[in-house]
Regions:
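Nucleotide/phosphate-binding catalytic cleft detector across ATP-hydrolyzing
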Residues: 1-154, 160-163
Length: 163
């Protein structure tokens, strides 16, 4: 049960990293919802496999588009399920860092942190995706040298010069 988690909340896939454990989840960013009841039936790979194989009232929802939240409620529910799968409980609320595209607005940034807090995070901080990629690649981000980062994702692609 990790107290520190990092989430790459991607348009196509979502990864969860737990401090000391590495990547503990790598799932498609999709949820299967029962439109009649509002219940979440599945998330990730399980929801992906349901596409086209369920009655019409069960829909697959991708709550992010181009790295920004398009459905706040579904995003919150997806983050809650991700936290549960990572071993988080009501009594074990983690600190969370979430990767976001550099170009999202301040309102979109607040939506991400609020969704994470409502989903069960004790604290939620954001890091821009190119910076997270540079840190993850072991680049010396505090050194007086320039590093170019190209982050290609399912919904956004970014290029950054980090020095």
């Amino acid at each position: 049960m990790a107290r520190d988690l990092a989430i790459d909340l991607g348009t196509a896939n979502t990864l969860v990293y737990a401090k000391g454990q590495g990547i503990v989840l790598n799932e498609p960013s999709v949820i299967a919802l029962n439109q009649q009841t509002g219940d979440v039936l599945a998330m990730g790979q399980e929801a992906w496999q349901m596409i086209g194989r369920t009655p019409g009232y069960i829909v697959a929802v991708r709550p992010l588009r181009q790295g920004a939240i398009t459905d706040f409620d579904v995003t919150q529910r997806m983050i809650r399920l991700l936290l549960q799968r990572a071993g988080v409980s009501k009594f074990n609320r983690p600190r969370v860092v979430i990767c976001v595209p550099s170009a999202i607005t301040e309102v979109e940034r607040r939506a991400v942190t609020e969704a994470a807090r409502r989903a069960g995070a004790a604290d939620a901080q954001l890091i821009e995706e190119p910076m997270a990629a540079a840190i993850g690649a072991g680049m010396a981000i505090h050194e007086p040298v320039a590093n170019m980062v190209i982050d290609v994702g399912g919904g956004t692609s970014e290029t950054a010069l980090i020095s």
